[in-house]
C-alpha cells in the first residue's frame, strides 16, 4: 500500500501548488498510483456483476430516468474535478438491491450497488450519500480490490460479493483519506465521510454483514478523526441535515420507497 500513501502525498502537494500558483495541475503525474490487480483479475471481477444480478435472490428495483440522471450528475462532478486520477470517459451503471441489510459495494468499470436498507435507514441526507458513494468511485476506477479466489459458479450471492470486495484495514484507511481529498476537490463537504464511518460504528449489529469484523470500524473512526484534525478541520463532530438535500435526492428516496 506504499503506492496509496504516495498518492495521498501527491494530492497534498498538488493542492498546495494549485492554491499558491497558476501551475497547470495536469503537470503532476499520477500514472501508476494505486495498487492494481492484474488485468485478467479486474476483468473477472467486473464480470461478476452479471453472475450476481443473475442470482435468483438478487432483486433490483427499476431506476427512474431522473434517479439515473441524479446519480450520473454526482458521479460526473466527482470525476470531472479529479481527472488527474479518475476517468470521465468511463460511464457508470447503478443498481439498487432490495435487501434488509445495509450495504454498498462497487466493481471495476464503474459498477455501483446500493441496498434499499442502506438508503432508507442511513443515507438520509445527500451529503452522506455522496460521501459513501465517493469511496466506491475511487475504488472502482483505480481498481482497489484485494485479489481473491473466484470460483466459476455461475452465480454470486450478496454475501459473496461483499467478501470479494472487502479490503484489508490498512488499505481501507488509506482509501478513506483518498476519498476525503476527492470530495474536497469536487466541492463537497468532505467531513461527511466521517459521519458515514460513525453511522457504521454506531450500528454495528445492523452492518454486521457489510463490516464483518465490527472491531475495526471503531479504530477506523478514531484514525479518520485524527486525519481530519491534521488537515486543520475544526468541529469534526457534525450532523448533516436531511432538509438540506436537493429535490433530486428526494426523488431518489421516493424511487427506493416505491420499489417501482
Locations of the language-model features?
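Sec-dependent bacterial lipoprotein signal peptides
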Residues: 1-17
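C-terminal capping/extension segments of zinc metalloprotease domains
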Residues: 19-49, 54, 63, 81-89, ...
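Zn2+-dependent metallopeptidase catalytic core
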Residues: 68-86
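Active-site metal-coordination segments of metallo-dependent hydrolases
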Residues: 60-69, 159-177
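Short alpha-helical catalytic segment bearing the HExxH-like zincin motif
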Residues: 113-114, 128-136
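Catalytic Zn2+-binding segment of zinc metalloproteases
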Residues: 122-127, 136-153, 187
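Active-site His/Glu-centered metal-binding helix of metallohydrolases
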Residues: 132-142, 174, 178
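Catalytic zinc-binding patch centered on the HExxH motif and its immediate surroundings
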Residues: 94-110
Amino acid at each position: 500500500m506504499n503506492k496509496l500513501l504516495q498518492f495521498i502525498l501527491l494530492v497534498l502537494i498538488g493542492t498546495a501548488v494549485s492554491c499558491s500558483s497558476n501551475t497547470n495541475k495536469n503537470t503532476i503525474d499520477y500514472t501508476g498510483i494505486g495498487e492494481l490487480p492484474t488485468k485478467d483479475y479486474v476483468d473477472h471481477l467486473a464480470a461478476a456483476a452479471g453472475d450476481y444480478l443473475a442470482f435468483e435472490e438478487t432483486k433490483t428495483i427499476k431506476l427512474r430516468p431522473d434517479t439515473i440522471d441524479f446519480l450520473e450528475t454526482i458521479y460526473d462532478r466527482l470525476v470531472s474535478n479529479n481527472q488527474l486520477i479518475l476517468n470521465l470517459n468511463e460511464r457508470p451503471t447503478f443498481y439498487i438491491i432490495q435487501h434488509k441489510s445495509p450495504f454498498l459495494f462497487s466493481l471495476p468499470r464503474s459498477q455501483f450497488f446500493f441496498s434499499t436498507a442502506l438508503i432508507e435507514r442511513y443515507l438520509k441526507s445527500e451529503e452522506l450519500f455522496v460521501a459513501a458513494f465517493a469511496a466506491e468511485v475511487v475504488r472502482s476506477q483505480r481498481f482497489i480490490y484485494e485479489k481473491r479466489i473466484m470460483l466459476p459458479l455461475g452465480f454470486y450471492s450478496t454475501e459473496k460479493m461483499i467478501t470479494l470486495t472487502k479490503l484489508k484495514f490498512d488499505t481501507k484507511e488509506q482509501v478513506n483519506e483518498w476519498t476525503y481529498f476527492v470530495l474536497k476537490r469536487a466541492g463537497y463537504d468532505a467531513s461527511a465521510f466521517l459521519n458515514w464511518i460513525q453511522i457504521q460504528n454506531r450500528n454495528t449489529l445492523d452492518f454486521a454483514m457489510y463490516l464483518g469484523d465490527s472491531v475495526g470500524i471503531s479504530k477506523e473512526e478514531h484514525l479518520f478523526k485524527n486525519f481530519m484534525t491534521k488537515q486543520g478541520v475544526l468541529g469534526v463532530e457534525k450532523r448533516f441535515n436531511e432538509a438540506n438535500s436537493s429535490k433530486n435526492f428526494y426523488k431518489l428516496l421516493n424511487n427506493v420507497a416505491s420499489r417501482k
